[in-house]
Amino acid sequence: MLTLGIDTSNYATSLAVFDTAAGEVVCDCKRFLPVKEGQLGLRQSDALFHHTAALPELLGELGKGADLTAIGAGGGSARPRPVEGSYMPCFLAGVSAAEAFCAAKGIPLVRTTHQQGHIAAALFAAQRARFFGQRELVFHVSGGTTDLLLCEGPDKIQCIGTSTDLYAGQAVDRLGVRLGFAFPAGAEVSRLAAACQEPVRPKASVRGTSCSLSGLQNQCEAFLAQGKSPEYTCKYCLLCVAETLRRMAAAARKEEPGLPVVFAGGVMSSDVVRQYLTARMPDTYFVPGRFASDNAIGVSILAAREVGQWPTLSM
């Protein structure tokens, strides 16, 4: 069976097709929302418009890589997180498109959330089938979250730590836009950071499993005002994020010793962040950027799981 996944976040319009028999992603496509120069994202009404305009074209593109007539179930992320009160209008575009597609074909529709899609994609990409049935710590680090989650697969999720103010992706994007890059700016910030050879001593404001990142933005602004190079400032920003995550994970492991840590979310696409954490944290799992940043792969996998067509993953 093939399953369809659609995710319409505040960053990108994403679609994916999953083959349950082969246990692999047949194809996926994504288009970032257009953001005007100097702006930090879109209003929800504008995001909803751009998703609605992009979906037919992307569905046509998806059809070039997969037989859409063979799809037996569909999934759509209907809201940001699986918690009461979680709502964002931009997700209406994707779940409505998924509902229309499934109704026209007479196939099941699975409603899930953006965060659960991220978790499923990360666990799948880590190629650890056992993760779906055991406890693990999962970081979801993006422009809208800096959440530390205690999970038993993508279904049972408990948020045990988060940022009390600014999210990691917001700090990164604000620095990138400040330097003249288009939003989202994470890739450019990471590129500049990787070019910096100067040593950096990162700082972190962490209390238990919660953190504060508003001071990071202020420090980056101060560095630029003092004449520090963009490369140094970007490296400082990303390493501070990485050190923050390391300390949050260390606090969580004191309460939940021995659990693996899986990283998901767009910020975790940065090689600078990954290298820092890999050198300092045992039993951690990072996934390729295709599965870390916003995508519909996890949604298509969750659709397969919910209709009883769970793939066989290599351990």
In which residue ranges do the predicted regions lie?
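Glycine-rich phosphate-binding/hydrolytic loop that grips phosphoryl groups
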Residues: 118-122, 287-315
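N-terminal phosphate-binding loop and adjacent alpha-helix
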Residues: 33-64
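A contiguous, well-structured pocket-lining segment that forms one wall/lid of small-molecule binding clefts
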Residues: 190-261, 267-285, 304-312
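Glycine-rich beta-strand-to-loop/alpha-helix junction loops that act as flexible
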Residues: 73-76, 142-144, 262-270
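Short glycine-aspartate micro-motif
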Residues: 3-6, 70-72, 90, 136-140, ...
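Short beta-strand-loop/turn "lid" adjacent to the catalytic site in phosphate-handling enzymes
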Residues: 57-96
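Conserved phosphate-binding catalytic cores of ATP/NTP-utilizing and phosphoryl-transfer enzymes
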Residues: 1, 107, 111-137, 301-305
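A short helix-loop
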Residues: 8-9, 16-18, 23-28, 130-134, ...
